[in-house]
Amino acid sequence: MFITSKEMRRIELNSRWLGFEEDFMMENAGAGVARVVIGEYSPNDVLVVCGTGGNGGDGFVTARHLDSEGVDVDVLLVGRREAIKNEAAELNLRRLDRAGIPVQEVRDSEDLESVDFERDVVVDALLGFGIRGRLREPVRSAVLRINEASRAGTRVVSIDIPTGLDPDSGETPDVAVEADLVVSIHRHKRGVRKLRDVFLRRVNAGIPEIAERICGPGDLITSDIWRRDPWSHKGQHGRVLIIGGSRKYVGAPQLAARGALRAGVDLVFLLTVDAVPKNDPNVIYRAVPAERLEPEHLDEVDLEGVDTVVVGPGLGADADSVGILRELAESFDGMIIVDADGLRGISGVNVDDRFVLTPHAGEFRREFGEELGRSLEDRSEAVRRVSEELGCTILLKGRVDVIGSPDGEIRWNVTGTPAMTVGGTGDVLAGVVAGVAARCREGFEAACIGAFVVGSAGCLAERRLSQGLTAEDVAEYVPKVLRNPWAAEPEAVTEVRRD
């Protein structure tokens, strides 16, 4: 299995959230690399060439384990010690010092002239999967020296990715290490698929399988929604339209609007009936004098001026949800989040990957005729079948939220609390998913992030307010999760294991 650098970073961060610290993963990775080096080459002497980041930390651990097996090891640190900001790498450098393993520091390219690179094996631990582009000095010169040694007969082993190779595209913008063997940590990175005459091995860093399947801080931190141009202007960070509300349900669309705003979008429009109070100054209202919303009411809004539309909160069972969704499917190019009564119209619409459906178990059963089993695996399989069949994203709400992608990938959200059974939290979720989708423009990613953020916000609200929280409280805690994604615990992770 080959994965992107973004996906690998997501998995690492989610592992840390589960309690598997970076030092633990680094120790396992480096020990695994050392075993591969010994098993493949049985070297007498090895030079481990390390950078100042996490890949260098893997190299420090590799050197220590090679030394413990009786291999003559030297470590070359390409960069200044004080430039190491990764705590686990810094810790493992100190361990090398205490183990008496020599570490030579290279501050500029001239320092490389005295280094003997012609060993039995050189381990490339300069740069990992998070770095791309042209190499800077003295790293570039170190790569050239490694390649000279390779041509002279030295075996070269790269940790995770050959330094200089783009981890995703496999392109080489400048120069790259000419490795004989690449030892991938956890999963092979996509970029190595383009390598020829290079052996691939994979070692386990101790990352649990569940870290790949859950939604967590890694989903949020690796998302593009964090990026804001200092010169950006109003509307550039997302514009959301909420379509909902009726004379019977006046609060639901307001809560969805609040969720979108708290997710960080710039502008939120609300198309609703005039019975809904226009009492939020942050929302731009488009109210029509009608009992319920109809497709022709879409003329009241500029669909070209929004990125994402939410259909359903408070819409009412008698609204023409089929007509509204059909019109949107034909005339709107952005993401469409369908919740609550909006789901009643799904059967009459050609759904595609622009759609994110957010049913609870009863709505899922009603709309898709799928009986949901009691186990998480049964529910996951049902979501997978429907999301693949429709070609859209489905977020099935529950104790553990199940998110299915158009191509059948399944993720689980394990945040949340029973206190969130209070009315309106689903409306907040629809708004948050829309807010995220307006910025990342990808339905599955938005659903994963939205579920994690809202569940975490509910946990924080309960921690502060106990059982008496409201949907508004949950919305108010959304920015706190965006600021600190680590604040909530993976409350329902034991439910996953139990199933």
Curated annotation (Swiss-Prot):
Region: ADP-dependent (S)-NAD(P)H-hydrate dehydratase, residue numbers: 217-499
Cofactors named for this entry: K(+)
Binding site for K(+): N55, D124, T163
GO MF term (any one): ATP binding
Keywords on record: ATP-binding, Isomerase, Lyase, Metal-binding, Multifunctional enzyme, NAD, NADP, Nucleotide-binding, Potassium
Gene3D superfamilies per the UniProt record, alphabetical: 3.40.1190.20, YjeF N-terminal domain (3.40.50.10260)
Annotated region described as NADPHX 1, given as residue ranges: 54-58, 128-134
Ranges where the record places region NADPHX 2: 360-366
Keyword NADP: yes
Residue sites binding ADP per the record: 397-401, 417-426
CDD domains: YXKO-related (cd01171)
Ranges of residues in domain YjeF C-terminal: 217-485
Domain YjeF N-terminal: 8-213
HAMAP family: NADHX_dehydratase, NADHX_epimerase
Function: Bifunctional enzyme that catalyzes the epimerization of the S- and R-forms of NAD(P)HX and the dehydration of the S-form of NAD(P)HX at the expense of ADP, which is converted to AMP. This allows the repair of both epimers of NAD(P)HX, a damaged form of NAD(P)H that is a result of enzymatic or heat-dependent hydration.
Record family assignment: In the N-terminal section; belongs to the NnrE/AIBP family. In the C-terminal section; belongs to the NnrD/CARKD family.
Official protein name in the record: Bifunctional NAD(P)H-hydrate repair enzyme Nnr
Record organism: Methanopyrus kandleri (strain AV19 / DSM 6324 / JCM 9639 / NBRC 100938)
